[in-house]
Amino acid sequence: DECFESIPLTLMVGAEQIIDDETFDQADFIDKVAACPECPKSACPSPERYMRAYDCEAEHIYAVTLSSELSGSYNSALLGRDLIMEDHPDKKIHVFNSRSASIGESLIGMKIQECEEAGMSFEEVVSTVEHYIEGQHTFFVLENLDTLRKNGRLSKVKALVASALKIKPD
């Protein structure tokens, strides 16, 4: 049995909460972020939410989370796994720290599917995918420096100078 499920983050722009699910409107979100003087924030899914997702009929369950450097999702997924394992100690669940975001997570999911379709054991899939993650590098390009300035990762002066010189971080 295949059990694919996306567990969304909750994004906050000002006082508004936006769920990052299939209804997410990226253009609308970007407009709201640009219009808001505060930096957007996010909340990771709860351990209970992960636990519910793990409660499926699949023999092998793999969770791929945002980088633990960017989000608490990895820790929540681990806690959710521990909770479900209390009642289902025979479940095979592995949580992958993607060390990435966006397309990096998708590529990891595709690698898991490729390994499963090749008939690898649970342990072989985990080992192969962990090795794959170690070799993966994801780069981001920012359109502007506003969010870095808003969240304090870049001073107002540095953001102003970099924007005036049309410098973007890489």
Spans of model-derived segments:
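Mixed-charge interfacial surface used for oligomerization/domain docking
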Residues: D1-E16, E69-S73, A77-D82, K91-H94, ...
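N-terminal glycine-rich anion-binding loop in soluble enzyme alpha/beta folds
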Residues: D1-R49
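A short alpha-helix capping/helix-coil boundary motif
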Residues: F29-K32, A58-H60, P89-K92, Q136-F139
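Short catalytic-loop micro-motif centered on adjacent basic/acidic residues
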Residues: K41, A63, V95
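Active-site cofactor/cluster-binding pocket
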Residues: P45-I61, T65-R81, M85-D87
